[in-house]
Amino acid sequence: MLKIQFHLAWHKAGAQPHRAFKMPGAADWMGEYAGRIGQHATCTIEGGPPKHGGRLWLLDHGTGSLVLSSEELAEALRRERDAGTDSLAVLIGGPDGYSEAAVSAMKPALRWSLGPMTLPHELAAVVAAEQVYRAWSILKRAPYHLGH
């Protein structure tokens, strides 16, 4: 079973995930979507950068990031699943994002953006989690996505 780890770059590794969120309700929403993803894959929320050799998806507002539709994200997730990926880290940057040198060193399998708008990093994390859950819903043809 695929393991998906949301890594919150602004949060200290090993600290309680709910403490990463100062916006009222953001931790609840993040936990809600992580739980929903957990119906399809093992899902965790962690602080700091990933420390494993798995695949990396980088949510980044920078130049070169792909703006994907929900269906395109679902297709990327399907490719990971079908390729036998066992661990997928979704890294969400902090308020300052990443330098091009840092992104280059990470070598992400997917560098994606939620669009040209600037969002608070906590909200971006929640939206990313919702979109990963929606991607699973698309792949499973679940009612969550139908009609949207």
Which residue ranges define each predicted feature?
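RNA substrate-binding interface of SAM-dependent RNA methyltransferases
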Residues: 1-60, 137
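Residues that cap or initiate secondary-structure elements
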Residues: 10-14, 63, 96, 118
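Intrinsically disordered, low-complexity coil segments
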Residues: 13-24, 64-66, 82-83, 103-110
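Conserved strand-to-helix beginnings and helix N-cap segments that scaffold or border functional pockets
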Residues: 23, 70-71, 125
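S-adenosyl-L-methionine/SAH cofactor-binding core of RNA-modifying enzymes
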Residues: 32-89, 95-100
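Short glycine- and Lys/Arg-enriched binding-loop motifs that mark or flank ligand-binding interfaces
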Residues: 89-90, 137
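Structured adenosyl-cofactor binding patch, chiefly the S-adenosyl-L-methionine
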Residues: 102-148
